[in-house]
Amino acid sequence: MNQKLLLQKIKTNFPKLKWKTVKDVSNGYDHSVLILDNKVVFRFPKNPYARSRFKGEVGLLNFIANKLKPILIPHYTYLPADKTFGGYKIVEGYPFIISSYKKLSNQHKRKLAVEIAEFLSTLHSIKPALVSKYILKDYARTKEFKRLYRRYKKSLYSLFNQTDQSRLEIFFGDLSKVLKEKHDKVFVHNDLFADNIFLNKNNHLKGVIDFTDRAIDDPAVDFIRLWNYNDPGFVAMISQRYNKFQAKDIFYRSHIYFLADTIWNMFNAIEKNKEKEKKWFYRKFKKAYKLIF
């Protein structure tokens, strides 16, 4: 979206709000994001999916904020009458990106694993019935994955060498088994990318943002993005602290889901004929597969 147009929307709806600096951090698929004076974050849904979920997200965040303390989440204080966009006081800290993870000592990693596990335990303990009104029914992702598989299987396999084709066959077999299993479903964030997790200056968990993709699903879903740190030990520590009785299962399922997410992105790159993305996700799949196999 045009930044001038977005700023004009803010001025029109909140004439008393003044600022000197604007930072555009619109690096996601669903929202344009502007930060004013490094104090207030404004999010503007930029597609039908995000727009349909925005109003519910505002209500959800108000409902769960106290339940998740001391971890901070966005609290929208700037909302126009039609609730088509909104602003909140910035969640202070720095995003838990891969380069930040690599700088942490083993002691800090262990402490952070405990904090993330405790956050997930608290989040997942919120009864689905209490938040269901804030969650729209997702489209059939598994059904869509199967459609892409049928249509682009040959194209996908052509990108892999013989050794990796064998690994791909094993993966699809494992995925099929996991998808047939029955698991208790819980309230999940469903998008715990590094950019959505914030640490304070002492490297403790400070806040979590962007609940756009919230869902009722397998708890292992919230462990998927943790594999991006390329450290199985870190995921294992979190899953063990989260639930020592189900730790191995959650560890395994989340890794299978992580691989599936990578293949999903490869399918989309094939469909849109994006050569660089196809190669990038191929390398990511190979690296992710070797983490535990």
Task: Cite the ranges covered by each PLM segment.
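An alpha-helical support segment within catalytic cores of ATP-dependent transferases
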Residues: N2-K18, E92, K109-V114, T122-N190, ...
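Short, surface-exposed alpha-helical segments at coil->helix boundaries
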Residues: Q3-L7, V58, P232-A236
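ATP-binding pocket architecture of kinase catalytic cores
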Residues: K20-K143
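Short strand-connecting beta-turns/loops that link adjacent beta-strands
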Residues: N38, A81-K83, K201-H204, L259
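Short beta-strand segments
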Residues: R43-F44, T77, F187-N190, V208-I209, ...
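Active-site Asp-x-Gly
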Residues: V186-F187, F193-Y252
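Hydrophobic alpha-helical segments that form the core
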Residues: H255-W264
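ATP/Mg2+ or Mg2+-diphosphate-binding catalytic cores
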Residues: N265-F293
